[in-house]
Amino acid sequence: MKNNYTSLKSPIDEEDELKTGHEIDLEKGLLPEYDSEEEGALPPYSDHARVSNPPNTHRENHSSGTTDDSSPFLIKLLISFTPIVLLNALAVWYLKYKDAFFKNYGAAEWTLFGFWCLVCTLVLIILTYFYETWTKAVKVTVIFLAQCIKVTAVFLAQCVKGLFNIRREMMIIIWILWLIICCILFGCVKDGRLNFNKALICSTCTISAVLFLIVSSVCIPIWTLWRALSGMLQVLGIHGIIAVLVNGSMSLFGKHFGWRGYEIEGFVLFFTSNALFLYEMERPGVLKRMRNTTGNVIGYICGGIEDAFRRIKNAFRGANDNNNIPLGEMDVEGEV
């Protein structure tokens, strides 16, 4: 095959090459002369020279330092000895707890102690010999446990977020469970299986209110906590009114009740509190509307009574005015 290579050099450049005998590199300057008869002599800018004399690397610049990355033997031995120390510390603590640390040792105990020392020595040798293997296993285990903890934390965070999203349903479920538990307790008290005193039975509503406060602080955001607290205070106020009415009824008709007074009071207060709570959760603000409605009804009744008294007063005033009219004026009015 013919070489179709065409030189891009101008005739002037070719004449300069013939005069100098070689090309001139503008960056490196003129090439020094070398003896081609010497063995292995190569021009300093040739490709073979670059390959045979590579540039200095970071490793060569720091050739004075060590290149062995493996841990020294003493460090391996110390790290391998650490788990054995921890294991023996647990054994010593257990013997101290049982008050049997080097006390009343016989032949069997000393034989067991020697066997334990032999096992610890063999374990130390094995851990030192397989240092890289078990350290890698420990690293992998630690990374795996860290990932498990991370996944668990993310899962719990999602669960908490879900609780905030369904806080009303969760609170109703928790409250119904508490209702069932308290009903079981009341039944056990009635059957005589449990001996609760009067304070515990009467404090059932207080326990329910505390549970409501705890659940509210956990499941309700802080900006709606005030509404929950106000609702709880309203429920407790209604509790007090009902308690007064129940105590008054028991004082009047105490002989007709088969149960003791504090049992009736506990039942009434407990079921009333649960009914009001569920009603408030299903329709937020119902207690406030109930209070406003009650106030309006009372105001309407009082206004009606006031109007009735005013009309009666006006009627009496009109009658008095008619009685005070003179007889002459009455005759004039009659003629007109």
Swiss-Prot record:
The chain crosses the membrane at residues 73-93, 110-130, 140-160, 169-189, 206-226, 228-248, 261-281. InterPro entries: WTF. GO terms for cellular component: cytoplasm; vacuolar membrane. Keywords: Membrane, Transmembrane, Transmembrane helix, Vacuole. The keyword Lyase does not apply. The keyword Iron-sulfur does not apply. Residues 1-21, 35-68 are annotated as: Disordered. GO terms for biological process: meiotic drive. It comes from the Eukaryota. It is a multi-pass membrane protein. It is found in: Spore membrane; Vacuole membrane. Belongs to the WTF family. Acts as a suppressor component of the dual wtf meiotic drive system, and can suppress but not confer meiotic drive by compatible poisons. Wtf meiotic drive systems promote unequal transmission of alleles from the parental zygote to progeny spores by encoding a poison and an antidote from the same locus; the poison is trans-acting and forms toxic aggregates in all spores within an ascus, wherease the antidote is spore-specific and targets aggregates for degradation by the vacuole. Homomer. Interacts with other proteins that exhibit high sequence similarity. This is Meiotic drive suppressor wtf23. It comes from Schizosaccharomyces kambucha.
